Regions:
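ATP/adenylate-binding site constellation spanning eukaryotic-like Ser/Thr protein kinases
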Residues: 38, 81, 113
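Conserved beta3-strand ATP-binding lysine motif
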Residues: 119
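Conserved long alpha-helical elements within nucleotide-processing catalytic cores of c-di-GMP signaling
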Residues: 1-28, 34-43, 49-59, 99-102, ...
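Catalytic-core segments of nucleotide cyclases and related cyclic-nucleotide turnover enzymes
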Residues: 59, 72, 87-113
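Catalytic strand-loop-helix junctions within cyclic-nucleotide turnover domains
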Residues: 44-54, 72-75, 80-97, 122-126
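Short catalytic/binding micro-motifs of nucleotide second-messenger systems
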Residues: 25-30, 62-75
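Active-site core of bacterial EAL-family cyclic-dinucleotide phosphodiesterase domains
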Residues: 129-147
Length: 147
């Protein structure tokens, strides 16, 4: 196994291309995949009628990471943290759905490698409270109120 950061951009790009191809094979013909930047991908899956269908899709996406990615002599073992937002429960426009999926993804990352989270409204409240607390702490440090 290797740390991807030790190999530079060219190898990182090859790993991302391989992951993109695996994800493309994991989704249905009517689904859409896009790289958002860095190592983040978005998958738009239309016409999922029930949670069971969503779970089946998540399992297929996670399976894309089961086998190591081999580039040259290096082998990379990767995992995915998946955030899920559902239309119309979690938003009615692309911006809101993507933001909420991103929030859920960060919760999945906190839970550990290879996990997923459905978006729930409490996640946004938690994120807002945390950002407010961090801002308050920064201000306290700047004013010399903490030792």
């Amino acid at each position: 196994m290797a740390d991807l950061l030790d190999y530079g951009h060219a190898i990182g790009d090859e790993v991302l291309k391989e992951i993109a191809m695996r994800l493309e094979r994991a989704i249905r013909k009517e689904d859409t995949i896009a790289r958002l930047g860095g190592d983040e991908f978005a998958v738009v899956m239309e016409s999922l009628k029930e949670a069971e269908g969503t779970m089946h899709c998540v399992q297929r996406l996670n399976a894309a990471f089961k086998e190591p990615v081999i580039v040259g002599d290096a082998q990379f073992v990767l995992s995915a943290s998946i955030g899920i937002s559902l239309y119309p429960q979690n938003g009615t426009d692309a911006h809101t759905l993507l933001r909420n999926a991103d929030t859920a993804m960060f919760k999945a990352k906190e839970a550990g490698r290879g996990t997923f989270q459905f978006y729930v409204e409490e996640m946004t409240r938690y994120a807002v409270e945390r950002a407010r607390m961090e801002a308050d702490l920064r201000e306290a440090v700047e004013r010399g109120e903490l030792e």
